[in-house]
Amino acid sequence: PLSQPKDEYVVSQIKWDWASQYVTEPVFTAPLVYVHEPDAHSGTPFFKHNHQPALTWCDNGDLLAVWFSTNEEKGREMVVLSSRLRAGSSEWEKPRMFYQIADRNLTGTALLNDHQGTLYHINGVEAAGHWQNLMMTLRTSTDNGQTWSKPRMIAPEHTKRHQVIAGTSITKEGWFVQACDAGPGGRDGAAVHISKDKGKTWTDPWDGASLPDFKEGGTGTTIAGIHAGVVQLKDGRLMALGRNNSIRDKEGHLRMPMSVSDDMGKTWHYSASEFPPIDGGQRLVLMRLNEGPILLISFTEHPYRTPKEERGMMFTDKSGKSFKGYGMYAALSYDEGKTWPVKRLLTNGTYRFLNGGAWTQFFEMDEGHAEPRGYLAGTQTPDNMIHLITSRFYYKFNLAWLKGNESIISPQSLSN
């Protein structure tokens, strides 16, 4: 038999000095490609559809991004690839194999750094093709992702409510919260799986009830919207925002649904958020920043499915003037999701013509237009820099940049 060539891939094990990287001035970097084609001789499979990423930071200062590569989203050829932005580097490495199970669809990937030296990787594994009957697997790394433990089944049934969504978080109790799509359809809502023992055992607090009527003031046991982002509020409640299952506000406009749980995910209370709904080829990020506020990154509309008269959102430029902007934006809340006084389009105004890959494809970026679609994943490093990936691009910015166009500084933001 042919001998396997030795893998020369080495990851630094030196702890990164995050404090030395801290900056107070505003930072926003131009979008940088992180999904590269592998070298032809590398043996790394690379299919035409590269999508649904996850992102985390490593203790050595590297960023680790992963995504699925496949020809068909239902396909059994699917693999999960990874790329690394090494500390101090300005270019993402070419992809490497990250996770492969022969003839199994692997939809749904999440990464987490537990701030205690361990990385967690959670992934769906199908019985065959499609993404509707997944089990969930988990593995860990204590060497910055150079090696990983053997995968362990944490939700072994091939069933619904197991489609992993990037954005795993840790509550103030030290519990892990993993959101999953509750079904394969676009309006099936989302579930949460909770681990109170650092990933050893997991429970979905769902009571088995069928999908509720997602309406203003309604309650149910499934989050409104797929691909949901979940964040813990300071009072211990969970808050989620998701895609589809839109709810009409008082003016009759369809809005992104907000779900809030005061019993750690057993029941959810639904309301219309102030944000426009998102749709196919789009996924939001919802996370709490180290500095305190809650950050939402989403899109002003769907570029094809939103009626033209409903597209765009109002933003404020540096001079305090209002303008209508389109595409990916960030919003900040200083009062636990009640209001979002800071909103900024994720562009620095430079004209660019870019290919966003996956479902995004070609788009123009300028002072009034940001990336129009993409599956988002985000993380914040200990130096307080915010890192965001879309389906093909990597962005880096900080709170100072997000607040740069803030025309009115609220008392809450001053206290933060």
What are these regions (language model features)?
Residues P1-N416:
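Asp-box/BNR beta-propeller blade signature and adjacent active/binding-site loops
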